[in-house]
Amino acid sequence: MAALYGGVEGGGTRSKVLLLSEDGQILAEADGLSTNHWLIGTDQCVERINEMVDRAKQKAGVDPLVPLRSLGLSLSGGEQEDAVRLLIEELRHRFPNLSENYLITTDAAGSIATATPDGGIVLISGTGSNCRLINPDGSESGCGGWGHMMGDEGSAYWIAHQAVKIVFDSIDNLEAAPHDIGHVKQAMFDYFQVPDRLGILTHLYRDFDKCKFAGFCQKIAEGAHQGDPLSRYIFRKAGEMLGRHVVAVLPEIDPVLFQGELGLPILCVGSVWKSWELLKEGFLLALTLGREQQAQNSFSSFTLMKLRHSSALGGASLGARHIGYHLPMDYSINAIAFYSYTF
C-alpha cells in the first residue's frame, strides 16, 4: 500500500490533522479540540492526536492499524526538548499503530513550512504577539511572545491597553494625549458598558478576561477607519512595534533568506493583520530605521503573506523531510502575498 504522511496543527483552542499521499495530495482531514500539552497534559494530548488521526485514516479509507510513514506535529510549546521527547515516547508506547516516525516542531515552524520551502519570519499579532525566525537549516530565534504582563507589543491586547492608558493618563493630567481623547473615551465606556473610569477597573482586575479586553481593539480599528486621529495614532504605533520585532531578529537571519524573489518572507498570523493599512506607516518606519541602524544592506526587500491552508500541511512536509522524503508542495496555493516592499 502507498505510504501516507500526516500533519497536525496543534492549537490552544482547536486542532487539525491532514493526511497526504506521496504526491502531496490532501486525502483527508479531521478537526479536534486543543492539543496544547501545557494546557491539557500529555495524556490527553496524545489521546486527542490519536483520535483525530484515526478519524482521518477512516475518511481516507485506510485501516487505522496501518501506521503512517511519518507524522509531523506543529505544536505550541514544540521548542521544549524534554516535553517533546516525552510526547513522542507516549505516542509510540500507547499507540504503536499511529505512525512509524514522528517529528514535533513549533507552531511557527509548521506555519512557515506551509508557506515557503526555505524558512522565513512568522509575525503573530492576534490577542497576543510574537515573532519567530526559522532559518533554512531549521534553527529558530525570536522576539516577544512573553504574554501581556511582559509585553505582547503590537497585539490586540496591547492596542486596547494603549487606548485605555492614554485616556486615563490624559484625564489624570499625568501625560498629555497626542490627540483628542473624546472618541476613544466614549468607545471605551460603550464597549465595557460602564459610565466612568472606576467601572473599567472591574474589567482590569476582578473580572479580567484577556480576550474580552483585547476585543476593544476592534473598536479602535473602527475609530481609525472613521478617521479618529488618536485611533490612527495607536495603530501606527502598533505597526512600529511589530516592525521592531522583525528588526530584532535581523542579525540572526541567514542571508539566503534575503535573496529569493520574495525578498525576506514574513508570514503574518492573527486578526490584527486585517487592519494592515492602519499598521503600514509605523511598520515601514521601524524597518527602514532598523535596517539603516544595523547597516543591513542585504535586506533590500520583503513580502508579507497570509496562509490559505492549515499549518498541518507544513507539519506533514517537515515530518516527511525528517525521514528523507520531500513531499511535493504548491506554495503558491498554500499562502497568498498581500504586500511587497523594496527599500
Swiss-Prot record:
Pfam families named in the record: BcrAD_BadFG
Sequence positions bearing Phosphoserine: S76
The protein's Enzyme Commission number: 2.7.1.59, 2.7.1.-, 2.7.1.60
Annotated tissue distribution: Ubiquitous.
Keyword Phosphoprotein part of the UniProt annotation: yes
Pathway: Amino-sugar metabolism; N-acetylneuraminate degradation
Quaternary data: Homodimer.
Protein name: N-acetyl-D-glucosamine kinase
